[in-house]
Structure formats: C-alpha cells, structure tokens
Amino acid sequence: MAERRRRLGDWGEAVAVAYLAQHGYQVVAQKWRCAAGEIDIVAQRDGVLAFVEVRTRRGVDPGMAAGSITGAKRARLMMLACLFLAAHDLPADTPWRIDVVAIAVASQGRVAIDHILAAVEET
C-alpha cells in the first residue's frame, strides 16, 4: 500500500510540474530536502518564488486534497520555505509564497487540478 501511495504522489508531482510549466512557471527545484523535511516543488514566475505543496488524492474533488493540509504541515512548510531561502543565500526581501496544487484522480481516469495561490500564510 505504501508503494502505491508513493507512486501516486510521484505521478501527482510530475503532473504538477507540467501544469506549472504550462502556466509560465520555471521549476527551480523538485523534492528539495533538508534535515527539517522536503518541499515538493520550488518554481518561479514574475520574480516570485512559489513553494508548492502537491496533494494528490483519488476521488473527484481536488478540494479534498487541498483540505488535507494540517496546521502542523502549514507550519512546517513555512519553516522549510525560510530554510530554502537561507540555504540559497537569497535576500530577505525575496518575494515568495506557498501554493498548493491539488490533484484529484477520478475512477474513470479524469484528472482535476486546482492551483491555490498563497494557500498557506503566516498566522
């Protein structure tokens, strides 16, 4: 079961990369890792870095995938974004946000994608 879930997640990330590229984003990094965790995708468009969390679920509603991000996950994503900026010596005033690309795969194979800009904000 874990292998099937990992394959679905990897597939979802590939779909998200293609989607972002089609919408004018340049992918800067994929699966960026540090001791604190992983950022699925880092992309840039119009001078703004987007740290993208990809959520892929079976079902018909991409909102279900987006809604699966807990408060702890939101806090971790904020921390990881700051660590990425520091690791790449980017200026403190670099514009950035955390997006979610939610992907729902219906049983008939139809795919629904919802790109939520600035889905995670500081609280």
Swiss-Prot record:
Pfam families: UPF0102 (PF02021)
Annotated family: Belongs to the UPF0102 family.
MF term (GO), any: nucleic acid binding
PANTHER family given in the database record: UPF0102 PROTEIN YRAN
Protein name per Swiss-Prot or TrEMBL: UPF0102 protein RoseRS_1723
Top-level lineage group: Bacteria
Lineage: Bacteria, Bacillati, Chloroflexota, Chloroflexia, Chloroflexales
